[in-house]
Amino acid sequence: MSGLTHFDESGSAHMVDVSEKPVTARVAVARGAVKMSAETLALVTEGRAEKGDVLGVARLAGIMGAKRTADLIPLCHPLPITKVALELTADPALPGVVVEATVKTGGQTGVEMEALTAVSVACLTIYDMVKAVEKGMEITGIRLLLKEGGKSGRFEASA
């Protein structure tokens, strides 16, 4: 593992200088889930939540979250994101909703934080939209599954 890049020689936090890095195609995929009761999941999948279309709103929130990552995470570079896609899948075996985000860019740094932020914001939105019926939901398993492009090459999480 290489050293921490967000600290200078004196130990102060700083934004990494990526100006000398080549522009390359980059992609990141992240996943997480919101565990809930089967009854709450039925509310979500049947469109009976009081606040409206839970999965549709969460998808939009995730896209917005990816686009605002540099505003939320202090040392992230603002990036020209070329794609954000979210898949929200009801999983009766959890029970709950699995959220997966794919983010792409052509740039000098990766989009891992954007993918992780998209998943996090989508999961938080699901929680917000149905917390009136179940406050004990669990947001879980948020992690990077894939990172590709740039000097460090390809990373794929183990199963």
From Swiss-Prot:
- Catalytic positions? D128
In short, the EC number is 4.6.1.17
Substrates-to-products reaction catalysed: (8S)-3',8-cyclo-7,8-dihydroguanosine 5'-triphosphate = cyclic pyranopterin phosphate + diphosphate
One biological process term from GO is:
Mo-molybdopterin cofactor biosynthetic process
Give the enzyme class. Answer: lyase
Against InterPro entries, the record matches this protein to:
MoaC, MoaC_bact/euk, MoaC_sf, MoCo_biosynth_MoaA/MoaC, Mopterin_CF_biosynth-C_dom
What does the UniProt record say this protein does?
Catalyzes the conversion of (8S)-3',8-cyclo-7,8-dihydroguanosine 5'-triphosphate to cyclic pyranopterin monophosphate (cPMP).
Q: Which family does it belong to?
A: Belongs to the MoaC family.
Description of how the protein assembles with itself and partners: Homohexamer; trimer of dimers.
Instruction: State the protein's name.
Output: Cyclic pyranopterin monophosphate synthase
- Organism this protein belongs to: Cereibacter sphaeroides (strain ATCC 17029 / ATH 2.4.9) (Rhodobacter sphaeroides)
Gene (UniProt) = moaC
